[in-house]
Curated annotation (Swiss-Prot):
Source organism phylogeny: Eukaryota, Viridiplantae, Streptophyta, Embryophyta, Tracheophyta
GO biological process terms, semicolon-separated: signal transduction
Catalytic activity, reaction form: O-phospho-L-seryl-[protein] + H2O = L-seryl-[protein] + phosphate; O-phospho-L-threonyl-[protein] + H2O = L-threonyl-[protein] + phosphate
Disulfide bond annotation, renumbered to this chain: none
The name this protein goes by in its record: Probable protein phosphatase 2C 39
Keyword S-adenosyl-L-methionine: no
Keyword Manganese in annotation: yes
Domain of life: Eukaryota
PANTHER family: PROTEIN PHOSPHATASE 1G, PROTEIN PHOSPHATASE 2C
Annotated family: Belongs to the PP2C family.
Classification via Pfam families: PP2C (PF00481)
């Protein structure tokens, strides 16, 4: 259900003292992840923090913020800070994820080109490392891989998610992981926030597999659309690998009847859902194979938030309590901003989720204990956390770690919430955040903070700014100075705030953004 909040655009004053500003500048070094991406009329460029300082005392000297009228976004920024102490996970999948794949993918401070092979994906490597197919339920997945390989290298160059010019940024903060992938030529953006718990193994697994899963299933959708709409052999359907047939299909959908457009968008959402289901099957299969050595893996899980943006189409999937919040100005001309929550809250704090859980287990008085599912977990839908889904995985745990009276699993579900939104001229930006952000700010407060900041700092970094404001508020609530809070080591700091991961996407073109920024 879409949640909307209205408030006055000019209601808050966000000035800070010079002491606080000095602390915030120093806090940049404590960010685990901080990246930015700006688009212009011809290309997008990465903001490498080694080259650019976007601190309160220094601004980028550039006039290349103008984007094409067809651009899906003007710029984005991402930032993350840890509070949980988490060891780097190097041993799942025989160490392949931690030792080989993640070092290749992680780029916490800038976007960089993805090095990929048309003949062997990261998922192939994982299958090889385990000596068998990653999942026992991979028939569709195997078909997609066969189609992929039979068409290489043409397929790889034609699919937007594997074109040679895509760039990725991301990294880890405590148990969280964040990724952002952009295809400059095809105008696609995909972002993921994976809020892990009981360890980071599940979030790490998502970071190295979910993107590839999305690639495969969108490619299958691409093939089906080409067949159904006669794009094979047409001039538009053969661009020598410059643009994606899926991009062409999207444009075709925009120019055709509403029924076709809705069917196409439903297909994209289905691809995202199937990609998560595939990752879930693969992860639990891996857990079952390795739980003799790592029984703790059965309790590891992650929330999932994925956003795919192309043109005016915004597709969102979520499991758990991370949020995507859209900021827009009503076309009526009212001097109000509107915060629209595009995601659902899958936790016991949501009455609908609470009642569904009880209804699914009507004869169990101990389903919820201490405001947690079986006394263990607050989120009702999540990736992984196999011991609350399968009895055999729960049996791998010893003593007090094992869930007693696991009568009718699953108790945690994997069916995600999905939604597609047609971006309009009223929509300004989208804020993606793990629940750590919303522990301190409501949806309307988040939108107001970003709006005011972008008005005062049109080429600043709103994701960093949100984390800075969160740290100030956390310190104030704990009766500490901001500097004292920053001195508390990771692990102990979890008493004051959670791991926090944020992505802010400024939608549309610079003309719209500048108009919104000067409307106060």
């Amino acid at each position: 259900m879409v949640d909307e909040e209205l408030f006055d655009k000019s209601s808050n004053d966000h000035s800070i003292s010079s002491e606080e500003e000095d602390m915030l500048v120093r806090s940049y070094s404590n960010l685990n992840v901080s990246f930015g991406y700006h688009c212009n009329s011809y290309q997008c460029f990465s903001l490498d923090t080694d080259e650019y300082d976007i601190s309160p005392n220094k601004r980028l000297e550039t006039n290349t913020m103008m984007t094409s009228q067809n651009g899906s976004f003007t710029c984005l920024s991402g930032a993350a800070i840890s509070a949980n102490f988490t060891l780097a996970n190097t041993n799942i999948c025989k160490g392949l994820i931690g030792e080989e794949i993640l070092p290749e993918l992680d780029s916490p401070n800038s976007f960089r080109k993805i090095v990929s092979s048309p003949s062997m994906s990261r998922l192939d490597l994982l299958s090889t490392s385990q000596g068998s197919p990653v999942s026992t339920e991979s028939s569709i997945f195997e078909i997609s891989k066969n189609i992929w390989r039979s068409s290489a290298p043409t397929t790889v160059s034609s699919n937007f998610l594997t074109s040679t010019e895509i760039k990725m940024a991301g990294g880890a903060a405590g148990e969280d992981r964040v990724q952002a992938v952009c295809s400059e030529k095809n105008g696609w953006l995909i972002c993921g926030i994976y809020d892990g718990f009981n360890g980071r193994d599940a979030a790490d697994f998502l970071a190295v597999t979910l993107y590839d899963n999305i690639v495969y299933y969108l490619y299958l959708l691409e093939c089906r659309i080409k067949q159904e709409n006669g794009l094979y052999g047409s001039p538009e359907g053969s661009l020598n690998g410059v643009k994606s047939e899926l991009t062409l299909a999207m444009r075709f959908a925009e120019n055709e009847d509403v029924k076709f457009s809705e069917t196409f968008r439903a297909g994209v959402l289905k691809c995202l859902t199937t990609a998560v289901e595939q990752a879930e099957n693969d992860f639990l299969c891996m857990v079952e194979q390795e739980m003799d050595d790592r029984p703790d893996l059965v309790s590891v899980g992650s929330c999932v938030l994925v956003v795919l943006l192309h043109g005016t189409d915004l597709c969102i999937l979520n499991l758990g309590d991370s949020r995507a919040v859209l900021a827009s100005v009503p076309s009526s001309g009212m001097d109000k901003l509107k915060a629209v929550q595009l995601t659902e809250i899958h936790s016991l704090e949501n009455p609908l989720e609470y009642q569904k859980l009880l209804a699914d287990h009507p004869n169990e008085p101990s389903v919820v204990m201490g405001n947690k599912i079986k006394g263990k977990l607050k989120v009702t839908r999540a990736f992984g956390v196999g011991y609350l889904k399968q009895k055999k995985l729960n049996d791998a745990l010893m003593g007090i770690l094992r869930v007693r009276n696991l009568c009718s699993p699953p108790y945690v579900y994997t069916n995600p919430h999905t939604v597609s939104h047609k971006v309009t001229e009223d929509d300004l930006f989208v804020v993606l955040g793990s629940d750590g952000l919303f522990d301190f700010f409501s949806n309307d407060e988040v939108v107001q903070l970003v709006y005011q900041f972008m008005h005062d700092n049109p080429i600043g970094d709103p994701a960093k700014y949100l984390i800075e404001q969160l740290l100030l508020k956390a310190a104030k609530e704990a009766a500490l100075t901001a500097e004292e809070l920053m001195r508390i080591p990771v692990g102990s700091r979890r008493k004051y705030h959670d791991d926090v991961t944020i992505i802010v996407i400024i939608l549309g073109n610079a003309q719209r953004t500048m108009t919104a920024s000067t409307s106060l």
